[in-house]
């Protein structure tokens, strides 16, 4: 008998020997459960594949059915088109037969009319017979044979000849053919079938058209995920965006164009006042008042004279508004004249309205007019001189003269009536009437332009800054232009006007000499105010702003180098990304 100690040792041995078997069984059990999971997943995948296949099959059947419907609709449409073509062909044949029949009838009628005209005799009159009988001296013996033979002859048959019976025969009436019930029934059945076929054709075409549109939308939605209507809306939106972009571009182009024009006018005003006046035309007085106000405000701002700055702003605004009001009145007069010219018989009235407005505008502002406007003013003055204006025009002319006088008195400008007498103006009119129309018009135009040039120069000289070399040259050129106008020989035909201009020029000459006397040492403008110098200043300013950034960059590079050279090592705990028990628990015993 074994001892208990030996039995305990044997029990341990049995347990130790059974451990591989238990581990194998456990491993087999785990493997089996894994296989079961895989089998379940495969079953699910197979079921999903079958479901997908079934869905694909159903959708394929639906697509095939839709294609069959389309084919049937197309075939019905083709059949309907063929039926329509046959019907049209039958109608064309019938129309052709009718045309041929009408043509043959017309040919026959034409030939009969030609024969009738050719065989028709000329109607004889009794004039020749009466002449012959009167010329015969012997009386003709009449024969009574016809009277004796007449009763012996049989009576003639009555003949009712219609003159049109030979080529317009009366058609014989044809009795209508009686149709049998069978033929009538067949005809009605044919008509019924024809109407049913046409009705079916109409419905087929309508259905096919609607079906084609729906199929087109479906195809476009399948291919492009977009319908035709949505594409049209997108095209509209694109067109709207394009229109907005084009509009913005046009606005930018117009803004640049007018900005360049304004800059060019500013440069001309500072360097060549005579050319500035001729190029700006009716806009010259308004631009001159704007530029004068800006220069004066700029000078007072730099000097720090705030009281003078306020006065300059108010005066400049008043001048600008005055010139703008005169320009608006001229524009309204031109618009009224254009409307009157459209009305028949109102051309002369339109010329009077526009000529009066141009004359008042030039006398008030001193604007330089173009050749066409100068001729309109001269023609109006010529009509007024000859007394060709109506009573209404004369009344309006008096009102305009009163307005111009009041405006000149408020602004301290001399009126042309105050510099000459009525007798001198009357004598001048008589002298001008003796000239030819062309010479009279030329004299009036030269006088108007010379007076306007003097008004412009007076305004320019009052605000000219003689400390600038460019302004001094511009004033001298404008003064020389006035002297040339005064020496124009055409002004000799207008002695009163020449006296008026001489009085104005004497004041201008005194003002000019005063400007030359008090003129400071004119110096050319510094190069710092030129566009190139301003551009250089902007570039230098940008470089100065970028310099601190460029100086700070080396320190940043050094810091990066220090960071990159750091070799400190940190001991980190090992970490895994799996769900295993870990490195330290992996050596444990069950």
Swiss-Prot record:
A GO BP annotation: viral tail assembly
Bias kind Basic and acidic residues: ranges: 176-185
GO cellular component, one term: virion component
Main location: virion
Entry keywords, A to Z: Late protein, Viral release from host cell, Viral tail assembly, Virion
Region (Disordered): 1-35, 147-185, 515-535
Entry's localization field: Virion
Role noted for this protein: Serves as a base for tail tube protein polymerization and acts as a template for tail length determination.
Protein name, entry field: Tape measure protein
Organism: Enterobacteria phage T4
Gene name of the record: 29
